[in-house]
Amino acid sequence: MLIDAHNHPNWHGFNAEKILRNMDEQGIDQMWLFSWEVPEDEYAPSYHAVLPPTGLGIPLEDVISVGRQAPDRFVMGYMPHPKRPDAIDRLKAAVEIHGIRLASELKVRLSFDDPDALRLYEFCGEQKLPITIHLDYPIDHGK
C-alpha cells in the first residue's frame, strides 16, 4: 500500500476530485489530509498564492469536507494551536465527532517543550494519535 503521509485539502486548488484523480494517476492508495491552524501574525500573505484567500491556513472544515468524500482513501488530521485554552477539548471533539485519526499538522512558532504543547502531546499519546510536526525554512511561496 502506498500512502501519501502529508497533504492538505485545497492546496494549489486541489479539491477532492482533483486529489483523487492525482492519487489514481500516481498509484497512491491512501492520503493523510492535514489541517493547519495558524495565528494571523504567523501567516504569510504569500500563502494566498497556493491556498484559497478566504481565511488563514487550512481549517478543519476543509479537511472534513474533502475527507468525507472518500473515507476509505483519506485519513483526516487536525491539530489545534497548543496555546488555545480549548486545544485539547477541540481535538477531543474532532476525534469523537468527526473521526479525526491524526494530530496533524503542528506548524507554529512555538518551542517543542512549551508546557501547553507538552499537555497537547500527552493527550495525543493517550488517544494514540500520531503527531506530525512541520519544520519550516524560508521558501518561495510563489510571490
Regions found by a protein language model. Name each.
Residues 46-143:
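Active-site gating/metal-coordination segments in enzymes
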